[in-house]
């Protein structure tokens, strides 16, 4: 990277850390530290909610997803607006009325202590794992592409976040999230406009989108009923709905964002802001990926975007086979470029058919390389989607923009990780520590909150450092959530809507439901989005069964 890029990157990240630490260094009590003193306005809440959800994985993986498979991933978010409306009508008023610090406090009020501890513990498990992954995912990709030390990157990201989160608490998050969202969105718009401006002179936006459409990259909707297909209209509107309902309604990393609101109305409007803007934001990020695909239709793209995989294959006994495939791929791409540059391409069915034939041939060549990697490099990921956008950034963006886009990725990593640490701290202190050690002073709980923030940050760093022992972690954020969210959501739905069910019924229903969901996940019978729906349904049905059984016995 150029010195200017280093300056832009370091300056941007330093501003976030210093501003968040200095501006919010004074917290008088636990309410200040965990709920920002209930002084947040609606747009601060909205930006904080969006920044929490927008991890580095969003900006690394989503463009690569669109590059490889098109815009269909947008269906994942179709259930979100409906879920947010329900949360605003039913969930937020309950939390506001009870003046809770965490969502799980409500469950003790409705059921009992053990149900509160169970759901809080499920949250701590899944969000504790996710915190490590949100650090590891960008660190592993940046370390491979930039040739930086992985452990150094993990520690750098982790301790930067710990610093302002531990000192400033929720107020620091609300302040930094506004800056981070501005950096992230402006960075993606700049990248999009630069790519459009870099296309050949005779290819305007309309023609570019026609080329993308010819390759199936603009297929937004899939109405098929294939339950194994991860992203369809139906999985998004049902499984995505339940995932969003659980994530925004019961996950403390999101609940804590709107619990800091000045009033019920401010909290509701802040969450509704996310419902309105989330799909357009994801559309923008996916569109960037589609335009990266279009850009590479006029350039020779790497046959595989993971440079570590390519380097190791070239050093192995499969190098001659790889070199032959790479050479054939080079010729195939050149033939495609010649056809695309023809002025009559978009009007000629014959040329389009020839182009699609070459496109299929190129995909087969890429699959052959992935198979070689899978069969010969057990410690290297053959799925290179997550490397597409970062590879484009480093190889084609001008000086200054490289630093800005890397700042986008690191800002996203910091925003999501800081929210996770903040939520893990509040849940640990409010739901576990404070009930165990009651009647301590306010200053004691404030001190312990900072200690637990540091502790969870260290745990996240440790888990991120051992994450290389596992496969495909970059893809697992939503999968991990789906394993736990359905059960937790089922408990909350029963708590709010089915008043006759008592504590023991819901407690044992939740445990059994979670066991069933884990078995279903291991069996790999369904796309992971459906686990959210099944978990909620199992919890509700089992709690009704236990309630009926208990009433008959009585």
Model-derived features: where do they sit?
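Membrane-embedded helix-loop-helix hairpins and adjacent transmembrane boundary segments
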Residues: 1-554
């Amino acid at each position: 990277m150029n010195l200017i890029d280093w300056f832009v990157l370091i300056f941007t990240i330093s501003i976030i850390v210093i501003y968040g630490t200095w501006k919010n260094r004074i917290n008088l009590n636990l309410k200040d530290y965990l709920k920002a003193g209930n002084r947040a306005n609606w747009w601060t809440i909205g930006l904080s909610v969006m920044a929490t959800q927008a991890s580095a994985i969003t900006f690394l993986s989503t463009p690569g997803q669109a590059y490889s498979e098109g815009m269909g991933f947008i269906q994942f978010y179709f259930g979100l607006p409906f879920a947010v409306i329900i949360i605003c009508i039913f969930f937020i008023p309950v939390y506001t009325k009870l003046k809770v610090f965490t969502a799980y406090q409500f469950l003790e009020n409705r059921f009992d202590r053990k149900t509160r501890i169970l759901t809080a513990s499920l949250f701590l498990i899944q969000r504790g794992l996710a915190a490590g992954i949100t650090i590891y995912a960008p660190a592993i990709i940046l370390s491979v592409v930039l040739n930086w030390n992985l452990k150094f990157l993990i520690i750098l990201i982790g301790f930067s976040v710990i610093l302002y989160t531990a000192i400033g608490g929720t107020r620091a998050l609300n302040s930094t999230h506004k800056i981070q969202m501005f950096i992230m969105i402006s960075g993606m718009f700049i990248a999009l406009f630069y790519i459009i401006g870099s296309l050949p002179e005779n290819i305007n936006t309309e023609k570019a989108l026609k080329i993308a459409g010819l390759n199936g990259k603009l297929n937004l909707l899939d109405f098929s009923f294939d339950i194994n297909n991860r992203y369809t209209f139906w999985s998004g509107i049902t499984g995505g709905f339940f995932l969003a309902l659980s994530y925004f309604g019961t996950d403390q990393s999101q609940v804590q964002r709107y619990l800091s609101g000045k009033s019920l109305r401010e909290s509701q409007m802040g969450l509704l802001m996310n419902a309105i803007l989330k799909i357009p934001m994801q559309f923008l990020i996916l569109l960037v990926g589609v335009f990266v695909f279009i850009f590479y239709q006029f350039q020779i793209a790497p046959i595989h975007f993971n440079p570590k995989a390519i380097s190791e294959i070239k050093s192995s006994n499969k190098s001659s086979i790889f070199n032959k495939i790479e050479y054939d791929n080079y010729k195939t791409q050149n033939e495609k470029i010649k056809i695309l540059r023809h002025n009559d391409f978009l009007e000629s069915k014959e040329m389009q058919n020839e182009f699609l034939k070459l496109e299929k041939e190129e995909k087969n060549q890429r699959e052959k390389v992935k198979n070689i990697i899978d069969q010969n490099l057990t410690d290297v990921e053959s799925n290179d989607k997550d490397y597409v956008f970062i590879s484009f950034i480093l190889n084609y963006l001008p000086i200054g923009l490289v630093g800005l886009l890397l700042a986008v990725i690191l800002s996203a990593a910091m925003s999501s990780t800081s929210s996770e640490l903040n939520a893990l701290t509040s849940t640990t202190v409010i739901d576990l520590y404070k009930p165990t050690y009651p009647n301590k002073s306010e200053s004691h709980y404030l001190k312990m909150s900072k200690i637990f923030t540091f502790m969870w940050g260290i745990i996240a760093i440790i888990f991120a450092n051992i994450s290389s022992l596992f496969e495909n972690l970059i893809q697992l954020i939503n999968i991990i959530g789906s394993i736990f969210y359905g059960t937790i959501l089922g408990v909350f739905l029963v708590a709010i809507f089915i008043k006759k069910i008592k504590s023991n019924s819901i407690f044992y229903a939740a445990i059994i439901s979670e066991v069933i969901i884990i078995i279903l996940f291991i069996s790999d019978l369904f796309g992971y989005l459906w686990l959210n729906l099944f978990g909620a349904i199992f919890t509700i049905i089992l709690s009704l069964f236990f309630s009926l059984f208990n009433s008959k016995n009585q």
